[in-house]
């Protein structure tokens, strides 16, 4: 069983017997139509693209109500195209990892072309220019990570031959401008707040610089700034797509699926002919398009206005997912866990995040209307975090915690203040913040040192707790005033809102010798 065996819906019995869902559409017909009249180019050929946007389009094609595929362009790691796309006719196998330990297998054939987005690849770049000049093009989109939207001064000085992704995209937009100021929507699908603004700011920066350098007419800058021509909608995406998993590899090999090996590129991208991802997924997009769009709602995408996208983001980041992640990761590191899924089998930790979410954060949740916060958090606690296939580690999640506490917990505290709610309802959120002062010591609950995850403020914050020791008996905790008064870290001065002393008391308990972390966590979780 190989991906290249599948041509024009060749539904061999063996695939069906082994539980593989094959495309229900005419692959060659979709390829031909897309080549002539492309509607969508996606930048970023990584695993998240194949597991989510490409799979959503595959579902839309399977419905029989749409007939165009997506063309993928890679602007960073060109080996992905040569090794993970072209040898397999641009098809891939999506393996859906369920929290029950079961898997679902689906062949994704919605990608019709794969291109290297750089002028050094002459044919590929010429094809991209041709696509951008075609009036049929409706949308370009991105999963290139937040760093991919960066603009470097050196790149701005390279004129019309930039090397960074945003510069290349702006150069392609210039081709579209020259073809008649054709309309287009530029759509970020990366997991960062107000992602459309990041693309917009980058494109506008390049365009303005090129006008200043006399390389392009001022009308080009006006074109990318004209929202009747070019738009940059916001979106909220949520799906975990880990590296190819050895357990999944073995399951596929046992089926007789031969394309089951892992590919590691020179740039250290981990990819494969298959992609494994969690079952739960959300993609909500601001419906602000200038030239039409592919009907991705046929594959489950939610379209709404910008305010609703922002509310969904706040619901996730401030209440239903990110605070739970941070809470269990701070304590998970001190309790020597290395897997989030394993933490979910710990009664104290599981109850800890349940009560933070449902009892303390949910009274002030931002309800977006199109997604139910209770259903969202229920999926997080009951399906996503316990998923045995998800190799996510608390050590990864606590990276840069100093930059995350204000949004993940400070916003909830501020909402209690703004609404005049009783802050005595806040017990476990203060316990998270107390745990941070204990985590910064880098000593686990057995008294052994552990490696603290990278954080830009680590040295400064560790210096604050340096006088403290993990020991029984009296010690001076007055240094904590220098931590918990920091609104730049917590979003509020915790003393000014009446929580500072409560948190200090919890820190004292957490520092009271070996075993104090477990004892304190259990005490407050049970009492809550």
Descriptions of predicted regions:
Residues 1-43, 47-528:
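Substrate/ligand-engaging "lid" and interaction regions
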């Amino acid at each position: 069983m190989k991906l290249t065996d599948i041509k024009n819906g060749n539904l061999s019995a063996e695939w069906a017997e082994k539980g593989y869902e094959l495309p229900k559409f005419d692959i060659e017909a979709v390829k031909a139509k897309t080549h002539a009249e492309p509607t969508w180019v996606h930048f970023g050929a990584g695993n998240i693209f194949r597991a989510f946007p490409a799979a959503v389009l595959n579902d839309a094609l399977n419905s029989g109500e749409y007939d165009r595929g997506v063309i993928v362009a890679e602007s960073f790691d060109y080996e992905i195209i040569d090794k993970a796309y072209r040898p397999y006719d641009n098809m891939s196998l999506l393996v859906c990892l369920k929290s029950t330990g079961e898997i679902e297998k689906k062949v994704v054939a919605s990608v019709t072309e794969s291109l290297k987005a750089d002028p050094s690849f002459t044919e590929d770049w010429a094809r991209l220019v041709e696509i951008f000049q075609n009036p049929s093009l409706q949308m370009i989109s991105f999963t290139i990570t937040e760093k991919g939207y960066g603009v470097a001064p050196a790149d701005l000085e390279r004129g019309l031959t930039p090397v960074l992704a945003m510069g290349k995209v702006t150069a392609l937009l210039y081709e579209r401008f020259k073809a008649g100021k054709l309309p287009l929507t530029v759509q970020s699908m990366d997991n960062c707040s107000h992602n459309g603004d990041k693309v917009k700011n980058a494109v506008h920066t390049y365009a303005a610089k090129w006008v200043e350098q006399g390389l392009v007419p001022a009308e080009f800058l006006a074109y990318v700034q004209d929202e009747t021509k070019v738009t940059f909608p916001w979106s909220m995406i949520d799906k975990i797509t880990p590296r190819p998993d050895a357990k999944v590899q073995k399951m596929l090999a046992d089926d007789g699926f031969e394309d089951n090996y892992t590919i590691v590129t020179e740039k250290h991208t981990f990819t494969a002919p298959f992609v494994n991802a969690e079952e739960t997924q959300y993609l909500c997009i601001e419906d602000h398009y200038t030239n039409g769009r592919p009907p991705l709602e046929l594959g489950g995408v939610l379209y709404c206005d910008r305010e609703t996208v922002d509310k969904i983001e706040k619901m996730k980041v401030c209440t239903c997912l990110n605070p739970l992640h941070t809470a269990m990761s701070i304590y998970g590191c001190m309790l020597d866990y290395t897997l989030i899924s394993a933490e979910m089998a710990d009664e104290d930790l599981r109850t800890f995040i349940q009560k933070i979410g449902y009892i303390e954060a949910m009274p002030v949740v931002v309800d977006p209307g199109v997604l139910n916060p209770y259903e969202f958090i229920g999926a997080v606690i009951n399906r996503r975090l316990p998923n045995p296939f998800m190799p996510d580690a608390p050590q990864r999640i606590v990276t840069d915690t100093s930059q995350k506490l204000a949004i993940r917990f400070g916003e909830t505290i501020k909402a209690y203040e703004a609404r005049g709610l009783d802050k005595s309802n806040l017990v476990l959120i203060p316990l998270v913040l107390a745990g941070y002062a204990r985590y910064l010591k880098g000593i686990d609950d057995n008294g052994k040192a552990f490696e603290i995850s990278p954080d830009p403020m680590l040295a400064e914050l560790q210096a604050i707790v340096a006088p403290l020791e993990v020991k029984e008996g009296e010690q001076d905790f007055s240094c904590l005033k220098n931590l918990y008064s920091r609104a730049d870290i917590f979003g509020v001065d915790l003393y000014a809102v009446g929580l500072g002393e409560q948190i200090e008391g919890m820190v004292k308990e957490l520092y009271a010798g070996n075993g104090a972390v477990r004892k304190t966590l259990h005490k407050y979780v049970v009492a809550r």
